[in-house]
């Protein structure tokens, strides 16, 4: 397993790769371990994103979860840059509860790539965010995408 931590304008981000797929994208600092072209390419894409110069990511993800969790994460990945959907919007598509969608968002190991920060409450408030920095970071990410 390879790991790469780097600093962005949103704080430290740590990428983890195994078997030539990204296994996690998390906020926070960790020790670098090994080298990987895949990690270096994703680092470049994330740095471009944090500067407002990239709207989509292109990488291979290793996604572990139940079939319903994977469907929810897929729905999140369809939310376009600069847009938001509610937990209820996602729940309705998959015939599940908004609360469950929120719980699955909190289990997302691929922050930014699977954009759980684009999911908000039906009353327009932000809801939660599992990334280090919580709601403040979620608001910052959404503001970046509004520009």
Q: How would you describe each model-predicted region?
A:
Residues 112-122:
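Short Lys/Arg-enriched helix C-cap and helix-to-coil transition segments
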Residues 125-147:
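…primarily DNA-binding HTH/wHTH and HhH modules…
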Residues 106:
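Residue-level detection of the helix-turn-helix DNA-binding "recognition helix"
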Residues 109:
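Acidic, glycine-rich catalytic loops of TOPRIM or P-loop NTPase phosphate-binding modules used
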Residues 76, 116-117, 141:
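Structural signal for hydrophobic
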Residues 1-99, 144-147:
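Basic nucleic-acid-binding alpha-helical/helix-turn surface characteristic of O6-alkylguanine DNA
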Residues 59-65, 121-122, 128-131:
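Generic structural "secondary-structure junction" signal
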């Amino acid at each position: 397993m390879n790991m790469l931590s780097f600093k962005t304008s949103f704080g430290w981000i740590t990428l983890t790769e195994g078997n030539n797929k990204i296994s996690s994208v998390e906020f926070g600092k960790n020790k670098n371990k090994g080298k990987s072209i895949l990690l270096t390419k994703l680092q470049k894409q994330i740095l471009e994103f944090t500067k407002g110069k990239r709207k989509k990511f292109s990488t291979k993800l290793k996604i572990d979860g139940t079939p319903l969790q994977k469907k929810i994460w897929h729905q999140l990945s369809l939310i376009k840059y600069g847009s938001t959907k509610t937990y209820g919007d996602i729940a309705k598509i998959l015939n599940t509860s908004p609360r469950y969608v929120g719980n699955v968002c909190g289990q997302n190991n691929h922050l930014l790539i699977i954009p759980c920060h684009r999911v908000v409450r039906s009353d327009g408030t932000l809801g939660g965010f599992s990334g280090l920095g919580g709601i403040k970071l979620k608001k910052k990410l959404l503001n970046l995408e509004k520009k």
